[in-house]
Amino acid sequence: MYYSVLRLPNGTELKGGEAGSTLKALTLHAAVNAGQEFTIASAFSDYIEAEIWADPDGSLQITAGDALTYYRQDDAGNRTKVGVFYAEKPTRTKRNSYKVTAYDTMSKLDADFSGWLHANQAPFPKPIWQLVQLACQRAGVALASSSLPINGNYSVQAFYADDLTCRQIISWAAEAAGCYAHMNADGKLQFLTYTDKRSTAKITPDGASNSTAYYADSLSYEDYAVKAIEKVQIRQSDSDVGVSHS
């Protein structure tokens, strides 16, 4: 069984999974795009929602902007780091209970980029990867990837747009590279490509040599109720009377 652990900036840990726990509930919402289809250029934030108990005589130790490190811990005490999340302003739901919503480091990339762009037109054109590095520097986000999967040297000409965010720069770079952007467990930005991890299985008898295979779980079927076929008419063209068979 796994338990949730939230580590606060001061090192305090809130633990769940047992009677009297400070961390009453925690839900992780994770996605790389908005739907079921592959979407390049996505730059989604994962986020957590936590219900935290606080002593009525004390105060909640979390404030807006705090970095919360989320771990999953098993019965043996082994921990897996899930991610780093930045808290929104906590909401008091009961006398001694608070709801905390926190978004991963991708949310920091919502910082403005237009101001820098307006003041730095002269150095263009720039490689798109350099633009990614500048956007991350502006937002205070570390990079896990050392380059884009492809097209990292694509030359970007001078441009300007109002209300442009660092996240939009990241999204454009991901689109140019045919990939998506996501944060790793250490809160660092990475550019990833979609990989098909489904297994394949041949549908021929054992021992038969056939290169045609299908992806497991990729086939589906449906049952339909149809009227009985009473007559078949064969025609060579729309104007042909044809031959009928009953």
What positions do the PLM features span?
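Solvent-exposed edge beta-strands and adjacent loop segments
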Residues: 1, 5-43
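Acidic, small/polar-enriched beta strand-loop surface segments
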Residues: 1-19, 171, 175, 180-246
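Surface-exposed cap/loop segments at beta↔alpha junctions
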Residues: 2, 54-142
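Extracellular/virion structural assembly segments
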Residues: 29-65
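Short acidic/polar beta-strand-loop edge motifs in secreted extracellular
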Residues: 35-37, 108-133, 146-172
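A generic structural signal for beta-strand entry/edge sites
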Residues: 45-49, 94-99, 186-188
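Surface-exposed or flexible loop/turn and strand-edge residues in extracellular/cell-surface modules
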Residues: 45-47, 65, 82, 216, ...
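Extracellular, surface-exposed passenger/stalk and repeat segments of large secreted bacterial proteins
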Residues: 87, 102-104, 154-159, 200-207, ...
